[in-house]
Swiss-Prot record:
Protein name as annotated: DNA-directed RNA polymerase subunit beta'
UniProt key word DNA damage: no
EC numbers for this chain: 2.7.7.6
PANTHER family listed in its UniProt record: DNA-DIRECTED RNA POLYMERASE, DNA-DIRECTED RNA POLYMERASE SUBUNIT BETA
GO biological process: DNA-templated transcription
Catalytic class of the enzyme: transferase
Annotated positions binding Zn(2+) 2: 777, 851, 858, 861
An example Gene Ontology CC term for this record: DNA-directed RNA polymerase complex
Family, as annotated: Belongs to the RNA polymerase beta' chain family.
NCBIfam families: rpoC_TIGR (TIGR02386)
Superkingdom of this protein's organism: Bacteria
Free-text remark on how the cofactor is bound: Binds 1 Mg(2+) ion per subunit. Binds 2 Zn(2+) ions per subunit.
Subunit: The RNAP catalytic core consists of 2 alpha, 1 beta, 1 beta' and 1 omega subunit. When a sigma factor is associated with the core the holoenzyme is formed, which can initiate transcription.
Length: 1377
């Protein structure tokens, strides 16, 4: 039997008048609701029983028929059908309108749909509908034009002049006639011709008109249906009227709105019968139009209709819109029965899969199950008696409850549920009291603590729901974080401290240096008090004695069998690494066993350690005063430079901040060093921080070092630091400065949490229909991944980037030629290690970004599911997981400022350049000049170097086994030394013989240098690691003379382009180029040689400080002008979250850079309209124009050679430019890198594939640039797959395909343009989405998750996938056991 649920698609259309009459069970003629005496509905009123059905079950209105046996009979007296009262939720009525009215959605919303069809403006349309102007419908043979508007006087004049030879009218009747007369086919072809004539310049209005006309044609809707003759009346149960205690009635606002419509309609009908004067009728029609507008969308009107308490009435649209609307409040978020909530407390005695459930709560939740068992066990014979027993709480009830909850999982949820681990299943254990007990190790997944947090309990009822809870949601099946595959169930705080204490080593204590044959002897010695936990001992393990400690023996003895001996001090990170390792090697069951052991041990030894903290544990370094004095001296020097005018105010500020940051860092290092040595490393504060149990280096710095610099509310750093720490106590001024940061922290947290929540919501909306649908899409495209480095520091290894993905190409060992990795093979941890060993640093892998699956993604392109560490299953909702993985840390990061209490965090800039590895300088690129003792870079430059990994003097070598410049990989023989030992390589690189040394060096690498860098080494030099090779000014960018000569100013005019400011602090005159832009003036400096020739020209950007005078003689390398860097801002995620928002919304940055559109030679041209024209001459001699706002600091000079995509001036990159100039793949890489950068800076690890899923959705659409023989419109934005499908059909028929270019759309816009109108409507702009969908007659295929939740289907992922719906379970009787 087919149920109403068995449908696969939903279509939305505009209802025709006949359709509305068809739905209706009768016309509502009166505005009455119910009779005040009988409290029964009035006949023909808004609650009429004849129309909407009976209010009493199986009884007619007059009471003639009273029983289910008369079902379906219509009473001959009152005409009410004998039926179920629930029909009052389904039956609709209608109102026949005395005059047509326009639907507000189609005429008032911008762009006005009726206006677009008829090509009239919204204001003109309003004036027609509200009976202010006439519109000419048929001009006949007069001078009037069709669609011309006439006011009253013009109309009277035209009537006198032309008589009845033309037709003009007003109101919705006129618009209806115009819409009926439209020929859509003719209009469509006319507009298409206009579009082609316009060529490149797409007219948005034309495009919109064409789209709306095509939508009407395809959907079968008629334009005149946007004008209503019949108004549907929704069922009365949906707009109920209920009696309150005081005898008064509360009614839905809709009833008031309907009453206004009916009253006005009836009055209009009467006026028409009486042939009332036109002006009165017209006014009544206008009021009818207004009342219908209010009914459909009251909040959209300029004058809102208000109820008795002067509150705006809630119309039909308002019931759908917003957070409290039908979609978000009732369809997507429902209240759940069989649920409860209570405070949580810690349950250290629980196993990982258990939770403690208060007995009282359990009894209430499992009541029906208990009742059933009571009846089955014949303790009682009816439900009423069973309920009584339960209320009395007899012993039998508790026994049955124990039996019922055994192996019946319950779900625990903590709000806010930021990712899927916010709901997990546990087996309940009955506990006394009223609090839920939670296992301490799952707190991290819930982000729960025990300071009053509450949690909700839900009971899965059906066997299938219980099975899913056991198999998929049990806490022991959720050990890994879906965002990155790291363990999410790991010990913290007390447990960590206990294990750290247990596994630490201490000198000179009982039992030190003893030897033991086995573990049990060690434990015996400890129990006899002849051995201390932290004593260093020797134990026989696998046949040989190993140096370890007694505590480590206890730890290893407790671990499950088969785990390698752990011989180190365990901090929280070490424990996480151990858990990961055990998971990979031994699987989840061993990890679960191990986690409970770790928990027991941790709590036990934390208790035994019983650490306390006192003032004497906080040690302030004696060197503090020295450091502070030194900083003050440096600052005095900076102030002195500023007073002399050597540096600008901004540079002074930046330098001061930098000095304090450096001093604070040095002091902290010293403090940590002292704490580490204190009590042999057993200083409690140091132990807490070092183990990762509580507190951080940053917090200890404030206790024992100095509090440091604070941030202002604006994010600027206050240059006066707090020199005291909390042990010494703060002075009044220091305390005052502190309050600023502390308040900022709290305010930020509150505001940003909402922001991050909204980001998650948008991401979920855009990605909710991305599900793994097929095994392999068969693509041959992939993306290139390599190690992410910052200088020489590895930020993300190749392993992190590529593990769990599938390869695109086959990779062979460069030396043996054997296949290491085949195409389409999963890249496992072992494979990565093999690849790294043979020196492979770049890989091309399959990625969600290049997946060609029509809907969702395929298994191979997605790769590994990180929550299981296995290839992803078909049916996994990877879109939602991606959105949660990105949004969840967003919310976490907003909390960061809170804990440090507003202490400023910014990198202190170093003015010296040194590299970690030793290296050889191969070559120098970029403009540079020789100055005394070095090379000065006048513009940005690059050093090409090779790093030296290994060196050995040739005199120590007997025989070299490799050739010069030969590639070497790990494990191959390099040479035989003088002792005859063969030395194997532990590095990947190239062998190099240089002078008297044998080296292993890297491939050539680039080191970028800033303008103004002075280099102290030369080409070919061998430089030791850590040696300073050059210096630069980190806070200013200089413009440097590249030739010798005399300065000549051009367009530098005081008061116009030059501003002289007297510095009030120093009394010096500072000359600054203004930001004002003048067409004719282009401030620049020429250098003139001895013959009077101009040999160099330098453009001066706005805000540049001049360092020279007109006519001054200058040498090579002198600074002409300099630009100060903006003052340091504190970098916390408050900078980061808005950045992520901007990237996902693809907003154009404020301070925009201009990118070179092509590769070629730069040519400077004039300034036009405040913008400097720069041409780039490409290889074919074609000029490409670039306009850059004058006053911007240019990064190129006349004659420079640039590559496409190079930045021409400073500023932020616009992602849309990246797409246009460098293409889709570069854009994907750019967005991925930018978003990852924000999260990485905060130490948050998110796998690339999650961000990839979102970016893929943002690039789903293409823009048509050539129509060909398809039905597309020029400039239209269509889905990629729709585009390919249409083209395929056209090519098959021998036609010309369309051409499109890729576009990038932000997440909000993408969510609104999603294929499913139900999903889009439930996101934002509900009424707009539904308006457009109804015109287009859209069909929702119910592919995504949201639309299925809204209509009450199972979601089409996992066990709810279509694949599994048709599976029938058959019993095979003959099956052999």
């Amino acid at each position: 039997m087919k149920e109403i649920k068995d449908f696969e698609k939903i279509k939305i259309k505009i209802a025709s008048p006949d359709q509305i009459r068809n739905w209706s069970y009768g016309e509502v003629k009166k505005s009455e609701t119910i009779n005040y005496r009988t409290l029964r509905p009035e006949k023909d009123g808004l609650f009429c029983e004849r129309i909407f059905g009976t209010t009493k079950e199986w009884e007619c209105y007059c009471g003639k028929f009273k029983s289910i046996r008369y079902k379906g009979i219509i009473c001959d007296r009152c005409n009410v059908e004998v039926t179920h009262f629930k029909v009052r939720r389904e039956r609709m009525g209608h109102i026949e309108l005395a005059a047509p009215v326009a639907h507000i959605w189609y005429y008032k919303y911008i762009p006005s749909r009726i206006g677009l069809l008829l090509d009239i403006t919204a204001s003109s349309l309003n004036s027609i509908l509200y009976y202010e102007k006439y519109v000419v419908i048929e001009p006949g043979d007069t001078d009037l034009k069709k669609m011309q508007l006439l006011n009253e006087d013009e109309y009277i004049e035209a009537r006198e002049r032309y008589g009845m030879s033309f037709n003009a009218s007003m109101g919705a009747e006129a618009i209806k006639t115009l819409l009926e007369n439209l020929d859509l086919d003719e209009l469509s072809s006319k507009l298409r011709i206009q579009m082609i004539d316009k060529d490149d310049k797409t007219d948005k209005k034309l495009l919109r008109r064409l789209e709306i006309i095509e939508n009407f044609k395809v959907s079968g809707n008629k334009p005149e249906w946007m004008i209503m003759e019949v108004l549907p009346v929704i069922p009365p149960e949906i707009r109920p009227m209920v009696q309150l205690d005081g005898g008064r009635f509360a009614t839905s606002d809709l009833n008031d709105l309907y009453r206004r419509v009916i009253n006005r309609n009836n009055r209009l009908r009467k006026l028409l019968l009486l042939n009332a004067p036109e002006i009165i009728v017209r006014n009544e029609k206008r009021m009818l139009q207004e009342s219908v507008d209010s009914l459909f969308d009251n909040s959209h009107k300029r004058k809102v209709v208000k109820g008795s308490s002067s509150r705006p009435l809630k119309s039909l649209s308002d019931a759908l819109k917003g957070k409290q609307g039908r979609f978000r409040q009732n369809l997507l978020g429902k209240r759940v029965d069989y649920s409860g909530r209570s405070v949580i407390v810690v349950g250290p005695e629980l196993k990982l899969h258990q939770c403690g459930l208060p007995a009282k709560m359990a009894l209430e939740l499992f009541k029906p199950f208990v009742i059933r068992r009571l009846i089955e066990s014949e303790a009682v014979f009816n439900i009423k008696r069973a309920k009584n027993l339960i209320e009395q709480e007899v012993d039998e009830v508790w026994q049955i409850l124990d039996f019922v909850i055994k192996e019946h999982p319950i779900l625990l949820n903590r709000a806010p549920t930021l990712h899927r681990l916010g709901i997990q299943a546990f087996e309940p254990v009955l506990v006394e009291g009223k609090a839920i007990k939670l296992h301490p190790l799952v707190c991290h997944a819930y982000n729960a603590d025990f300071d009053g947090d509450q949690m909700a309990v839900h009971v899965p009822l059906t066997p299938s729901a219980q099975a899913e809870s056991w198999a998929l949601m049990l806490s022991t099946n959720n050990l890994l974080n879906p965002a990155n595959g790291h363990p999410i169930v790991f010990p913290s705080q007390d447990i960590v401290l206990g294990l750290y204490y247990l596994t630490m080593e201490k000198k000179n204590i009982v039992g030190e240096g003893k030897k033991f044959l086995n573990f049990s002897n060690v434990i015996l010695a400890i129990n006899n008090r002849s051995l201390d936990y932290n004593a260093s001992i020797y134990v026989k393990i696998d046949g040989e004695y190993k140096k370890t400690t007694a505590g480590r023996v206890i730890f290893n003895e407790a671990l499950p069998k088969g785990i390698e001996f752990v011989n180190k001090t365990l901090s929280d990170l070490e424990l996480q690494i151990l858990i990961s390792k055990v998971y990979v090697v031994h699987g989840s069951s061993t990890v679960i066993e191990m986690l409970d052991i770790i928990k027991e041990l941790g709590f036990k030894y934390a208790t035994k350690f019983g650490c306390t903290i006192s003032m004497s544990d906080i040690i302030v370094p004696d060197e503090k005063k020295t450091y502070i004095d030194r900083a003050n001296k440096e600052i005095a020097k900076i102030q002195n430079d500023y007073a002399k005018g050597v540096i600008t105010g901004e540079e002074r500020y930046n330098n001061v901040v930098s000095v304090w940051l450096k001093t604070n860092e040095e002091l902290t290092n010293k403090m940590m060093e002292i704490l580490k040595k204190d009590r042999d490393g057993f200083n409690v504060i140091y132990m807490m921080a070092d183990s990762g149990a509580r507190g951080s280096r940053n917090q200890i710095r404030q206790l024992a070092g100095m509090r440091g610099l604070m941030a202002k509310t604006s994010g600027d750093i206050i240059e006066l630091p707090i020199i005291s720490n909390f042990k010494e106590g703060l002075s009044v001024i220091e305390f005052f400065i502190s309050t600023n940061g502390a308040r900022k922290g709290l305010a930020d947290t509150a505001l940003k949490t909402a922001d991050a929540g909204y980001l998650t919501r948008r991401l979920v909306d855009i990605a909710q229909d991305v599900v793994v649908r097929i095994e392999d899409c068969g693509t041959i495209n992939g993306i290139k991944v390599e190690t992410v480095k910052n200088g020489e520091e590895i930020l993300e290894s190749l392993k992190e980037k590529a593990v769990g993905s599938y390869s695109i190409e086959r990779i062979k060992n460069p030396i043996t030629g054997e296949i290491v990795l085949d195409a389409n093979e999963e890249i496992s941890e072992a494979k990565i290690e093999l690849l790294e060993k043979i020196g492979i640093e770049k890989l091309v892998i399959r990625s969600v970004l290049t997946c060609e699956a029509e809907h969702g993604v395929c298994q191979k392109c997605y790769g590994r599911d990180f929550s299981k560490n296995k290839p992803v299953n078909i049916g996994e909702a990877v879109g939602i997981i991606a959105a949660q993985s990105i949004g969840q840390p967003g919310t976490q990061l907003t909390m960061r400022t809170f804990h440090i209490g507003g202490v400023a965090q910014a990198g202190s800039e170093d003015d010296k350049i040194s590299l970690k590895n030793a290296f050889i300088l191969n070559s120098i690129e970029g403009f540079n000049v020789n100055v005394d003792n070095g090379i000065l870079f006048t513009r940005k430059g690059t050093l090409k170097i090779i790093n030296v990994f290994y060196e050995e003097k040739i005199k120590n070598i007997k025989e070299i086994k490799v050739l010069d410049s030969q590639r070497v990989i790990k494990g191959i023989p390099l040479f035989v030394n003088k002792k005859g030992v063969e030395i194997l390589s532990s590095y990947i690189g190239y062998a190099k013989l240089r002078d008297d040394k044998f080296l292993i060096v890297s491939e050539e690498q680039e080191v970028a240098l800033k303008a103004g860098t002075k280099l102290e080494i030369g080409v070919g030099d061998y430089v030791e690691s850590g040696k300073v090779i050059g210096t630069f000014d980190p806070f200013a960018e200089p413009i440097i003379a590249e030739v010798k000569g005399k300065i000549k100013f051009k367009d530098i005019i005081l008061g116009t382009t030059l501003k002289e400011e007297i510095n009030t602090e120093t009394g010096n005159v500072e000359k600054r180029i203004t930001d004002n832009v003048f067409e004719s003036l282009d401030p620049r400096i020429f250098i003139i040689d001895s013959s009077g020739m101009e040999v160099a020209s330098y453009v001066l950007p706005g805000d540049a400080y001049l360092q020279v005078e007109d006519g001054q003689n200058i040498n090579i390398g002198d600074v002409i002008a300099k630009l100060s860097k903006g003052s340091e801002k504190t970098q916390d995620i408050t900078g980061g979250l808005p950045r992520v928002n901007d990237l996902f919304e693809t907003r154009i940055p404020k301070n925009l850079t201009e990118m070179a559109k092509v590769s070629g030679i730069v040519q400077f041209k004039s300034i036009q309209k405040g913008k400097r024209l720069i041409n780039i001459l490409d290889e074919y001699g074609v000029e490409h124009k670039h306009y850059i706002p004058a006053g911007k600091h240019l990064l190129v000079r006349d004659g420079d050679v640039v590559k496409a995509g190079d930045m021409l001036c400073d500023g932020r990159i616009n992602p849309h430019d990246v797409l246009e100039i460098l293409g889709g793949i570069s854009l994907q890489e750019f967005l991925l890198a930018e978003i990852q950068d924000v999260y990485r800076k905060q130490g948050v690890s998110i796998n690339d594939k999650h961000i990839g899923v979102i970016i893929k959705q943002m690039m789903k659409k293409v823009k048509i640039v050539a129509v060909g023989d398809t039905n597309f419109v020029y400039g239209q934005k269509v889905d990629k797959h729709t585009f390919y499908e249409q083209n395929r059909k056209v090519i098959e028929q021998g036609g010309e395909p369309a051409i499109a270019s890729p576009i990038l759309i932000g997440v909000t816009k993408t969510s609104l343009n999603i294929d499913s109108f139900i999903s889009a409507a439930s996101f934002q702009e509900t009424t707009k989405v539904l308006t457009d969908a109804s015109i287009a007659g859209k069909i929702d295929d119910l592919r995504g998750l949201k639309e299925n939740v809204v209509i009450g289907h199972l979601i089409p992922t996992g066990t709810g996938m279509g694949l599994y719906k048709k599976i029938k379970v058959s019993e095979n009787i003959d099956a052999k056991v």
